[in-house]
Amino acid sequence: MKINGNEIRPGNVIEHQGSLWVAVKCNAVKPGKGGAFNQVELKNLLDGTKLNERFRAAETVERVRLEQKDFTFLYQQGDALVFMDSESYEQLELQKDFVGERAAFLQDGMTVTVELYQEKPIGISLPDQVAVTIVEADPALKGQTVTSSYKPAILENGIRILVPPFMNAGERIIVDTNELIYLRRANEKDK
C-alpha cells in the first residue's frame, strides 16, 4: 500500500532502497524556506543498520504489512532454535543469532510472536516478562538498606543482571526481557 512521506509513523514498516525498514522516530519539520518534510529514523529489519531519511509530502513509499503468527518454542539443537506453529503444527527452525541475546530467556512451551514477510521470518517477539531463578548472588551487607543499591546476580540462563540486596540464590524473579532488568519477585501465579 502506497503512503505519502508525511504519513509515515513510528512502527510503520516500509520498503525503501530495496529493503524492509521500520520507522523508529518521526519528526515533522517545517523550515522557514522550502517545503515541509518528515525526518524519519529507520532501522533495517534484516541487518539492524540505522538510516536517517527525509521524506517530502509529495513522495510516496510502499508500506508493508507484516503477518504475525504465534509459535511455541520446542527445543534448541546446537545453534538452531525449533518452534512450532500453533495453528498448523509446522515446525520453524531459526538460528540463535536471529533472536539475539534474548534467546537465553526461551523456555520450553513459551509462546512467541514471529513476524513474517512473504512467508519469511524477519522478526521475533518474546514475552516482555519472564520468570527465572537466581543461581548466584552475593550476600547482602549490613547497612545497605539505607541506599537503593543493587548487587550483581547470575540467572539460571547465564544472564547477569542487578537485583535488590534482599534477593538471594534460589529465588524466582521476574525479568524484563527487553531491558534485561529486575522487575519484581515472582509469586505463585508467575511460576
From Swiss-Prot:
<comment type="pathway">
    <text>Protein biosynthesis; polypeptide chain elongation.</text>
</comment>
<keyword id="KW-0648">Protein biosynthesis</keyword>
<keyword id="KW-0963">Cytoplasm</keyword>
<protein>
    <recommendedName>
        <fullName>Elongation factor P</fullName>
    </recommendedName>
</protein>
<dbReference type="Pfam" id="PF09285">
    <property type="entry name" value="Elong-fact-P_C"/>
</dbReference>
<comment type="function">
    <text>Involved in peptide bond synthesis. Stimulates efficient translation and peptide-bond synthesis on native or reconstituted 70S ribosomes in vitro. Probably functions indirectly by altering the affinity of the ribosome for aminoacyl-tRNA, thus increasing their reactivity as acceptors for peptidyl transferase.</text>
</comment>
<dbReference type="Pfam" id="PF08207">
    <property type="entry name" value="EFP_N"/>
</dbReference>
<dbReference type="GO" id="GO:0043043">
    <property type="term" value="P:peptide biosynthetic process"/>
</dbReference>
<keyword id="KW-0251">Elongation factor</keyword>
<dbReference type="InterPro" id="IPR014722">
    <property type="entry name" value="Rib_uL2_dom2"/>
</dbReference>
<dbReference type="Pfam" id="PF01132">
    <property type="entry name" value="EFP"/>
</dbReference>
<dbReference type="InterPro" id="IPR012340">
    <property type="entry name" value="NA-bd_OB-fold"/>
</dbReference>
<dbReference type="InterPro" id="IPR015365">
    <property type="entry name" value="Elong-fact-P_C"/>
</dbReference>
<dbReference type="InterPro" id="IPR011768">
    <property type="entry name" value="Transl_elongation_fac_P"/>
</dbReference>
<dbReference type="InterPro" id="IPR020599">
    <property type="entry name" value="Transl_elong_fac_P/YeiP"/>
</dbReference>
<dbReference type="InterPro" id="IPR008991">
    <property type="entry name" value="Translation_prot_SH3-like_sf"/>
</dbReference>
<comment type="similarity">
    <text>Belongs to the elongation factor P family.</text>
</comment>
<dbReference type="GO" id="GO:0003746">
    <property type="term" value="F:translation elongation factor activity"/>
</dbReference>
<dbReference type="InterPro" id="IPR013185">
    <property type="entry name" value="Transl_elong_KOW-like"/>
</dbReference>
<dbReference type="InterPro" id="IPR001059">
    <property type="entry name" value="Transl_elong_P/YeiP_cen"/>
</dbReference>
<dbReference type="GO" id="GO:0005737">
    <property type="term" value="C:cytoplasm"/>
</dbReference>
